[in-house]
From Swiss-Prot:
PROSITE patterns: RRNA_A_DIMETH, SAM_RNA_A_N6_MT. This protein produces a dimethylation of the adenine residue at position 2085 in 23S rRNA, resulting in reduced affinity between ribosomes and macrolide-lincosamide-streptogramin B antibiotics. This is rRNA adenine N-6-methyltransferase. CDD domains: AdoMet_MTases (cd02440). One of its GO terms (molecular function) is RNA binding. The gene is ermM. It comes from Staphylococcus epidermidis. One of its GO terms (cellular component) is cytosol. It holds the Pfam family RrnaAD.
Length: 244
């Protein structure tokens, strides 16, 4: 995505009072190394450097990079990189967390990038509230792919009045906690196939009628419109047993 389009999609939070309210929901300590996605004008970056060991801010807008550096002139535990987060290569040999107030229009791309291309153990993001709810919806393929790798929580609402320019909708702070992948490497392709057939309701392509009924019963599913991720995993495991 080019710099111009990202600029037009950015909404900033600059009030220290509002930033402090958001920061109370983020678990950080003086040993943490943080990658910040989009430093903006440096308001969150300033709070992060005061709480953490080291902050690497990744900002595509070179003018905002300078603004952030100027705001943090009294600190030395940070760096600002003028890069596109979607092209950035996260380190594979160190422990870190990620924070970002990310653009609405590339939220899916950013989350896919940081879940599957980074090893961050905790990820905190400010995203549009409706989008956050969709990440918890087991009828959506993207949610099912994410849930296999991370636990997803909505931590708090972030009212639209916190931002400037003010967006049309409210946002929320979410946390993605890394866990041991629920899908083995050898089953990834099979899981991807199962997810896509399931969300498209192509049940006959993954189960016979008897297999389907038995799998639902084993998973304790009474309503196909209301299933947990654990129940979905039970269905997938049944599918694997039937297709050895």
């Amino acid at each position: 995505m080019n710099e111009k389009n990202i600029k037009h999609s950015q909404n900033f939070i600059t009030s220290k009072h509002n930033i402090d309210k958001i920061m109370t929901n983020i678990r950080l300590n003086e040993h943490d190394n943080i990658f910040e996605i989009g430093s903006g004008k440096g308001h969150f970056t300033l709070e992060l450097v005061q709480r953490c060991n080291f902050v690497t801010a990744i900002e595509i807008d070179h003018k905002l990079c300078k603004t952030t550096e100027n705001k943090l002139v009294d600190h030395d535990n940070f760096q600002v990189l003028n890069k596109d987060i979607l092209q950035f290569k996260f380190p594979k040999n160190q422990s870190y967390k990620i924070f970002g107030n990310i653009p609405y229009n590339i939220s899916t791309d950013i989350i896919r990038k940081i879940v599957f291309d980074s090893i961050a153990d905790e990820i905190y993001l400010i995203v549009e509230y409706g989008f956050a709810k969709r990440l918890l919806n087991t009828k959506r393929s993207f949610a099912l792919f994410l849930m296999a790798e991370v636990d997803i929580s909505i931590l708090s609402m972030v009212p639209r009045e916190y931002f400037h320019p003010k967006p049309k909708v409210n946002s929320s702070l979410i946390r993605l906690n890394r866990k041991k992948s629920r899908i083995s490497h050898k089953d990834k392709q099979k899981y991807n196939y199962f997810v896509m057939k399931w969300v498209n309701k192509e049940y006959k392509k993954i189960f016979t009628k008897n297999q389907f009924n038995n799998s639902l019963k084993h998973a304790g599913i009474d309503d196909l419109n209301n299933i947990s991720f654990e129940q979905f995993l039970s269905l997938f495991n049944s599918y694997k047993l039937f297709n050895k």
